[in-house]
Amino acid sequence: MTQSNLYIPSRGDIVYLDFDPTKGHEKKGLRPAFVLSPRAYNEKSSLALFMPITKQQKGYPFEVSLPTGLKVQGVILADKIKCLDWKFRGVRFVESVSEDVIEEVPIKIEPLLL
């Protein structure tokens, strides 16, 4: 893949990427993830903030439900933020979510940060 057609993750995208290596209870393997960080940061640093997505909805306060009709179904685990090198993790774009979902994510993580 050449630099000119390289996909750059953007806030609100759902992507697949490899979370391995991991330890303990961390989400692992090739899985869907929500992109939290803005495209400008992701492009400049080759890093991005990702939140794994799981089909196992458990009702935890940090889950953000994905609306029906998307290719990826489940919940964003907003408390599992990871900063990863997306170029080396084999990131693949799937789809983008609505502004409603993008706006709900920071609301869910605010109690962890303040």
Please annotate each region the language model reported.
Residues 1-114:
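Conserved functional hotspots at enzyme active or ligand-binding sites that engage polyanionic ligands
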